[in-house]
Regions:
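A short, surface-exposed loop/turn module that caps and links secondary-structure elements
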Residues: 34-59
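Generic preference for hydrophobic/aromatic residues in regular secondary structure cores
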Residues: 7-8, 47
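Enriched for short, Lys/Arg-rich terminal
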Residues: 1-7, 16, 26, 41, ...
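Hydrophobic/aromatic residues within well-ordered alpha-helical segments
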Residues: 10, 21, 25-28
Length: 93
């Protein structure tokens, strides 16, 4: 029984944030995305205005980063990436 590959899509906000990173930082983000692809429930589920959104926290060079995403069994949609400062306010947009 072969499993279908998971499709990963990204929002324009995530793409903008990702583009600004250095290569080493991009590797850390790629590792975090692989963790999310393997187990989408690893992130913390949000409530209220952000219901249905999960946030995975990881570190890049001692800086805590947050990656917001939504998922269903076949896809992972990356919404935003950034530090905690104003992260949730920007995610609501």
């Amino acid at each position: 029984m072969a499993t279908q590959p998971v499709q990963v899509t990204q929002s324009s906000a995530f793409a903008r944030s990702y583009k600004k990173l250095h290569n080493r930082q991009k590797q850390d983000v790629n590792s975090a995305v692989q963790v999310i692809v393997a187990d989408p429930l690893v992130g913390e589920g949000k409530r209220g205005d952000l219901a249905g959104v999960y946030v995975y926290k990881f570190k890049i060079q001692a800086q805590l980063m947050l990656l917001a995403y939504e998922f269903d069994p076949a896809t992972r949609h990356l919404l935003s990436l950034g530090t905690h400062e104003n992260f949730y306010r920007e995610s609501k947009r």
